[in-house]
Amino acid sequence: MDIKEYSKLIKAKRKELDDLMKRKMPVIAGRMAKDHFQDNFRREGFVNGGLHPWPKAKRLSSGRTDAAGQYGTLLSGRNHLFSSVKYVPADYRVRVADDLMYAPLHNWGGEVHPTVTPQMRRFAWAKYYQASGKAKKAATGKKKGKKKGSAASNEPQENPEALKWKRLALTKKKKLRIRIPQRQFIGESKELSDKITKKTENEIRNILNL
């Protein structure tokens, strides 16, 4: 096929090619991007020129045996962050995003300074009992002292996860300073760009019967 024949073929297929780039590829590329970014959660790292592993969540090394201790970093029983990755196709383009309020904080890292409220303390106590495996004791109105040498004074040390929640429940601070490490899951990715380029080229070849 010489250049004139190729130019004639392009003109004949112009409508199909335009429909591909305007309508079909934004949907195809969006789906590919969503799958790629969600796979970052499963791999626990960001893929761009290779896998860049995330810092491990502290709960994974806390010795917890409950369900929460088994989920990977940034994953949970509800998977809000994972499930909120979405794509919105438009003419000749597609927007891929995670619109959860705290998504940018995890994606880029940073600090938050939440106010310590009574609700937060109650939540911390609930998480403490969950992480420690202890049953919440009913209030009796009486305080019992620990006798020296008693079984109570020889209780095993609490695991780091439970201790973290206990400290939060008992803190005297009015505001907290919490640093969130970067765990990028959305952004420019060489591997994703290469896959989309290859898919686009294949779709064009199919239209031109090349």
Question: What are the roles of these predicted feature ranges?
Answer:
Residues M1-L210:
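Short, Lys/Arg-rich flexible segments
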